[in-house]
Amino acid sequence: EKNANSRKAIEAQVEAIRARVEYADVQPVFMEEAPFIADCFTATDAPHIVMVPFFIADGLHTVEDIPVLLGEPSARVKKRLAAGHPTWRNPTGRKGKLVWYTEAIGNEPGLVDVILERADEGKSQLSRLI
């Protein structure tokens, strides 16, 4: 059974991005539950889609599974991967839209600040116990 916390975290981020009103439309999509990644083409009327994988690192899902779910042929993805090339090329036309696919958010250098903030919270709790 799926833990709802993962979905809630993504939906909270989507709401925060929507609140900034920098993009015409912001929609969450998921690998294993609706709305699915392939639904991104019908989830918006926007002609351009920027797909940002909410993963801590680039790995199997981000470099193989998601490009295939976005319509990239599996054989092409595997061939590019074996050659050490990116498995997605920006922008790529799919279903009448242009799709840009980014790296996982965990590759963002600013994430260090979030990690340190959490560590400081832990250190603060520890200092109260000592």
Q: What do the predicted segments below correspond to?
A:
Residues 1-130:
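Active-site-proximal alpha-helix that buttresses catalytic centers in soluble enzyme cores
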